[in-house]
């Protein structure tokens, strides 16, 4: 049900952005690299896909507002899970996917470069831990909450009127683990909280 709702919402946003008057818009296609702060692993080792749509509007000669809706894969990856001599031996990593809505203010630094910052909200589609065998089934309480909220900064390099390359760093401002709120902390004994951190690279194509 969550996935069907996300697909319908995504299609609705695309239709709205393509018909809205006085707005620009387009599509987004790229890659995400991510980590989860507080999962006792480190490094942007998790690769995933990023796909979506955007709508934007000029506020002044140098400022514009942009709203996006994207499907993005996040999480963490433990490349040393099977290395018995490494401190990360047998430590679980995380796979997650979200529908994300970034709200951005963009500043036109030059004719080819924009600087951007903003807020994001995200709805969790799926998330789970992985061990050496694969996905760890969730038998009782889901270890992840349904929503993620964060801050982001980025730059947008313009190749042409139609195409630009966006590089962006985002980070959760609230923990994403359910055990950080109300349940025994099964996965994180240090109780540091878990936070998504994402470095993404995406092509933006303007209609």
Q: Where are the regions that the model predicts?
A:
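Residues that define the transmembrane beta-barrel architecture of outer-membrane proteins
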Residues: 23, 43-49, 95-99, 145-151, ...
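Repeated loop/turn-to-beta-strand initiation elements of outer-membrane beta-barrel proteins
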Residues: 23, 62-65, 113-115, 161-167
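Outer-membrane beta-barrel "beta-signal"
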Residues: 24, 32, 157-163, 193-207
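Membrane-embedded beta-strand positions of outer-membrane beta-barrel proteins
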Residues: 27-29, 67-69, 103, 117, ...
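Transmembrane beta-strands of outer-membrane beta-barrel pores
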Residues: 31-35, 71-75, 121-125, 169-175, ...
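Flexible, solvent-exposed loop segments that connect beta-strands
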Residues: 37-43, 73-97, 125-146, 176-193
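Membrane-embedded beta-strand positions in outer-membrane beta-barrel channels/transporters
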Residues: 50-54, 64, 100-102, 152, ...
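Outer-membrane beta-barrel strand-turn architecture
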Residues: 57-61, 107-111, 159-161, 207
């Amino acid at each position: 049900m969550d996935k069907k709702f996300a697909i319908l919402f995504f299609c609705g946003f695309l239709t709205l952005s393509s018909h809205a008057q006085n707005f620009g818009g387009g599509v987004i296609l790229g890659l995400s690299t991510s980590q989860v702060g507080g999962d006792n692993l480190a490094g942007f080792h998790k690769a995933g896909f990023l796909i979506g749509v955007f709508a934007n509007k000029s506020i002044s000669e140098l400022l514009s507002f942009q709203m996006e809706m994207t499907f993005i894969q996040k999480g963490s990856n433990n490349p040393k899970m099977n290395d018995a001599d490494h401190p990360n031996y047998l430590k679980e990593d995380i796979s997650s996917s979200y529908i994300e809505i970034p709200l951005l203010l963009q500043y036109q630094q030059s004719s080819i470069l924009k600087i951007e910052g903003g807020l994001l909200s995200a709805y969790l589609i799926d998330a789970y831990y992985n061990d050496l065998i694969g996905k760890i089934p969730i038998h009782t309480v889901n270890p992840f909450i349904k929503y993620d909220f964060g801050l982001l900064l980025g730059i947008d390099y313009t190749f042409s009127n139609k195409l630009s390359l966006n590089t962006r760093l985002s980070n959760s401002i609230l923990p994403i683990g359910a055990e950080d709120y109300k349940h025994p902390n099964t996965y994180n004994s240090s109780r540091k909280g878990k936070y998504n951190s994402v470095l993404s690279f995406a092509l933006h194509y303007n209609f």
